[in-house]
């Protein structure tokens, strides 16, 4: 079992914050500081976004964070260089669209992840049918390709998505972009329970989660939550103490 899956399988109430690499007043020089803060608060893993000019799955908060990072000339190459010097016991998960990876070179990208704390990849615009672009390069590495499973995904398709999944299953709690609040289907709890029965891999819920009420709800029917827009917004507004408090409360339900 790879590191990411082992870490998330060992407990319930997993909390995975999302941050945008380079969205800091000191740009990428502040990345390590943010990771250490999130680790010390009790994060199970940390999702690190790569800024992209056409972020189709991102809501306005994360899109603006990406634009701020791009304005600081943050790139995938520079992020990978920064990660080499970051030491953390918490597994890092890179969230990137496929184009930056393709432009960088897939084999070069995976090679650059060696000797870093990166243990997972999320590529939202890479469908299951095209995973062969990536998987041959990570099969023998301690890196997982994390699938996203939408609320509207038919059961037959869910089975295909989770059959050989590693790390965790990213259950998309809403239809649409990240950051939407209070748009949850009343069928969501059933959806998550059904999905969890299809796999032994931890199922984590993300998209739109912004309150402790949301966290408590989804911790009951999945292995934990991924919180993006709230974390990104609070960090941008220098509310680090709020972030720490939120995470500590979230993992102690």
Curated annotation (Swiss-Prot):
One Pfam family cited in the UniProt record for this chain: Trp_syntA
Gene3D superfamilies on file: Aldolase class I (3.20.20.70)
Record key words, sorted: Amino-acid biosynthesis, Aromatic amino acid biosynthesis, Lyase, Tryptophan biosynthesis
Keyword rRNA processing: no
This protein's pathway: Amino-acid biosynthesis; L-tryptophan biosynthesis; L-tryptophan from chorismate: step 5/5
Keyword Lyase: yes
Cellular component terms (Gene Ontology): cytosol
EC number: 4.2.1.20
Membership in a protein family: Belongs to the TrpA family.
Function description: The alpha subunit is responsible for the aldol cleavage of indoleglycerol phosphate to indole and glyceraldehyde 3-phosphate.
Name of the molecule in the record: Tryptophan synthase alpha chain
